[in-house]
Design a protein with these regions (language model features):
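His/Asp/Glu-enriched short active-site or ligand-binding loop at hydrolase and phosphoryl-transfer sites
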Residues: 133-146
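Conserved short secondary-structure transition element at the edge of the structured enzyme core
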Residues: 154-172
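Conserved active-site loop/cleft motifs that coordinate metal ions or position small ligands
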Residues: 135, 167-173, 200-202
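Alpha-helical scaffold segments that flank or form the walls of functional sites
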Residues: 1-13, 33-40
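Histidine/acidic-residue-rich catalytic or RNA/ligand-binding cores of hydrolases
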Residues: 24-28, 117-124, 144-160, 177-191, ...
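Extended substrate/RNA-proximal surfaces in nucleic-acid metabolism proteins
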Residues: 19, 24-136, 191-201, 207-224
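Short acidic/histidine-rich active-site segments
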Residues: 18, 166-180
């Protein structure tokens, strides 16, 4: 993955394996080992983290807080159907909001699947209040994606993000090396909507890192 990112001219690569709950994913020992992995390879910066599962309507996460805090450079939470029972719009929205409010979480992954209906205004408002990033997922927009209605759902979410000045992060969801750095669908969507570049935090390495750092400082103050 790092070599592919370097070959494509990227300056930073985030590697976020699925946490426990997804069949066949990494166990706890893998994430503990992240502390010793180099943060620079092939001339690019590396950030290691996890896409942690939201496992119930109360926003419970599938990874212990001590592991999240001590081992992860990037802390993402998302809903995945193998480990989540779909509820009502209110229940699904609450699951996301509780994860957004969790000070351990930096990013909410692909909140764009019509199979998990949510209230987008509530989600965007919570993201703004808690300084949590919402992901625009390139894989969701692909015609082969198992997620349903992502294009329309992301249009709704992005319009609200623009109106409320809520920043987003673009993600490739690359599960193999050739997909690293591929944002083709995201680029089309953002261009069609004329979405402000200044609200896309990974437009530069410095902006992304600063956004995550600022998010954690604000949330830390809120906890103290």
């Amino acid at each position: 993955m790092a070599k592919a990112a370097a070959d494509k001219g990227l300056k930073l690569l985030g590697i976020t394996e699925h946490a426990q709950g997804i069949p066949g994913t990494c166990d706890e020992i893998y994430f503990h080992n992240m502390r010793i992995i180099p943060r620079k390879m092939y001339g690019i910066d590396l950030m290691f983290g996890s896409e942690i599962n939201i496992i119930d309507h109360d926003g419970t996460l599938s990874m212990e807080e001590k592991i999240i805090e001590k081992t992860l450079d990037i802390r993402i939470a998302g809903i995945h159907l193998p480990c989540y029972e779909v509820g009502t719009v209110t229940q699904n929205t609450n699951a996301y909001v509780k994860a957004i409010e969790n000070p351990m979480i930096d990013i909410i992954s692909h909140p764009d699947d019509s199979r998990i209906p949510i209230d987008y205004e509530t989600i965007v408002d919570a993201a703004k209040e808690n300084h949590t990033l919402l992901e625009i997922n390139n894989s969701s927009l692909d015609s082969l994606s198992s997620r349903v209605g992502a294009w329309q759902n992301l249009q709704i979410m992005l319009q609200m993000c623009e109106e409320k000045k809520v920043p987003v992060v673009a993600g490739t969801d690359a599960h193999f090396s050739s997909a690293v750095g591929v944002f083709d669908h995201v680029e089309v969507l953002l261009q069609e909507m004329n979405f402000p570049e200044e609200l896309v935090v990974n437009r530069s390495v410095d902006v992304l890192k600063q956004e995550i750092l600022q998010h954690r400082e604000i949330r830390k103050i809120g906890r103290d």
